[in-house]
Regions:
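Boundary at the C-terminal end of the N-terminal hydrophobic targeting segment
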Residues: 22-29
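Bacterial N-terminal signal peptides
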Residues: 11-21
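Bacterial N-terminal signal peptides that target proteins for export
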Residues: 2-13
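A domain-start/cap signature at the N-terminus of enzymes
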Residues: 81-116
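Alpha/beta-hydrolase superfamily serine-hydrolase fold, recognizing
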Residues: 29-41, 45-81, 107-365
Length: 365
């Protein structure tokens, strides 16, 4: 298989949180000397109500497994695990059917990328080769639990091609090298720099997945509170909108989520990002924000196999109950940030069509 395709599958599958430390195991590998600890209470179930493509990927996931994680403020410890790519994810990439779906999508939207700097923050600019300048832009805020990941957006060309937008992917400083306040300010700086370059706020959209979803929403709240222009639209994929273990599905989906486990994977990452006393600050956990003062139209997408489902619902309710415009778009049987996990499946295509329609409706108004 083309090495470029393998790389794209791995980065697409990793961009949310799988980059280092949420490792799906095949049934044969589970319990046979795999590194790290596993969620032994995981109850595998592949519903027949999802697409065959999604069923294929879900069968390859048998529960969260994590590397032994550093203590929250161990900077060198976190650095050491960031370049780890799970061998199990490489195996998924080698699957001929999955690789063909990814290859077909990549070939449909070849793209270019270049590194840059906006507002003193590293960024990567990504655009489909068919992109034409329409003075609109999509700012992408990556996931990875705030402690992993980077601005190399595995789905960037596809998203650019589908939406017709140039993408600016933010290379914010990872925790614990920086804490939430500095990281949030970096996202604000990028958005403000685009305004200074002549982009009206109404022509700027923001996409954030997982931790990046929480960060994107928190940054927009901070922009509003500082009196800066707020973006025209916001899209959140499985947002980590409450980094404390608060919410129904942290408990009720604990055994059903094939990727995430709070105690095993998320707690130390949350503490690396924000001290416990700050974790319900609205800029850290935006479900606690005051949305009555204004907020962009927001599309929230998630799945029913994700412990962040309550984060999706609570974020939606916070915006909607304050009179804001919000759309909650939930997909049957889908795991955390499924757009990068079941890439090429009908569910991902449907979610992208919904996002495309949403941005066309609200961006530039």
């Amino acid at each position: 298989m083309d090495r470029r395709i393998t790389t794209r599958i791995v980065t697409a599958g990793c961009f949310a949180l799988l980059t280092c430390w949420a490792v799906p195991l095949t049934a044969q590998q589970q319990g046979k000397g795999a590194a790290g600890s596993t969620n032994s209470s995981y109850e595998a179930y592949v519903p027949d109500t999802v697409s065959p493509e999604a069923q294929q990927v879900l069968r390859m996931m048998t529960g969260p497994q994590g590397l032994p994680l550093p203590e929250p403020n161990d900077i060198e410890g976190w650095k050491k695990i960031r370049n780890y790519v799970p061998p199990q994810l490489k195996e998924i990439a080698k699957n001929s059917e999955i690789s063909k779906r990814t290859s077909d999508a990549i070939k449909r939207y070849p793209s270019t990328s270049k590194e840059g700097n906006l507002g003193g923050v590293p960024v990567v600019e990504i655009a489909s080769e068919k992109w034409q300048d329409n003075r609109k832009v999509l700012v992408y805020v990556h996931g990875g639990g705030y402690v992993t990941g980077g601005p190399d957006f595995g789905l960037g060309g596809w998203v650019s091609g589908e939406t017709g937008l140039r993408i600016i992917s933010v290379g914010y400083t990872l925790a614990p090298e920086a804490k939430w306040d500095r990281i949030t300010d970096q996202v604000v700086s990028v958005l403000h720099a685009l305004e200074e370059e002549g982009y009206p706020p109404k022509n700027i959209a923001v996409l954030g997945d997982s931790a990046g979803g929480g960060l994107a929403a928190g940054a927009v709240l901070k922009m509003r509170d500082k009196g800066l222009g707020i973006p025209g639209a916001l899209v959140l994929w499985s947002p980590w909108s409450d980094i404390t273990e608060t919410g129904d599905t942290y408990v009720t989906l604990k055994r059903a989520d094939p990727l995430l486990n709070y105690k095993l994977l998320l707690k130390k990452a949350a503490d690396a990002y924000a001290d416990p006393k700050d974790q319900k600050n609205p800029y850290v956990s935006p479900v606690y924000g005051d949305y009555s003062k204004g907020f962009p139209p927001t599309l929230i997408q998630g799945g029913t196999k994700d412990i962040f489902l309550s984060n999706c619902v609570r974020e939606y309710r916070a915006i909607d109950s304050a009179g804001g415009t919000a759309v909650l778009d939930i997909y049957e049987g889908m795991p955390h940030v499924f757009q990068g996990i079941v890439f090429g499946a009908p569910e991902t295509q449907q979610s992208m069509a919904k996002m495309k329609q949403f941005l066309a409706t609200y961006l530039g108004r």
